[in-house]
C-alpha cells in the first residue's frame, strides 16, 4: 500500500509535535520539510529522518507532490 505523504511548512515546535505523531502511523510519512531558513529545515530533516528539506515553500511544493500539507507557521 502506498504511504500517505505529508509535507510540513515551518520547522518550529508545533511542526516537531506533528512529525512525531506522523511517525507513529504506519502508512504515513513526512516527505519534506520547508522553512524560510534552509539551515533550519535541514536540521529538522536530520532530526526526524525526513528525506527532503527546503528553504523555500514554493520550491518544496513544486518539487514534492504531497497528499497533504501541514502548515505549522504562525498566523501573524
Spell out what each predicted region is.
Residues 1-48:
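N-terminal Rossmann-like dinucleotide-binding module
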Residues 52-76:
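Beta-loop-alpha module in the N-terminal Rossmann-like domain of NAD(P)-dependent dehydrogenases
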Amino acid at each position: 500500500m502506498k504511504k500517505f505523504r505529508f509535507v510540513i511548512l515551518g520547522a518550529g515546535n508545533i511542526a516537531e509535535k506533528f512529525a512525531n505523531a506522523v511517525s507513529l502511523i504506519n502508512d504515513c510519512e513526512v516527505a519534506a520539510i520547508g522553512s524560510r531558513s534552509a539551515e533550519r529545515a535541514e536540521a529538522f530533516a536530520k532530526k526526524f529522518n525526513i528525506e527532503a528539506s527546503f528553504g523555500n515553500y514554493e520550491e518544496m511544493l513544486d518539487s514534492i507532490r504531497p497528499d497533504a500539507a501541514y502548515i505549522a507557521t504562525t498566523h501573524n
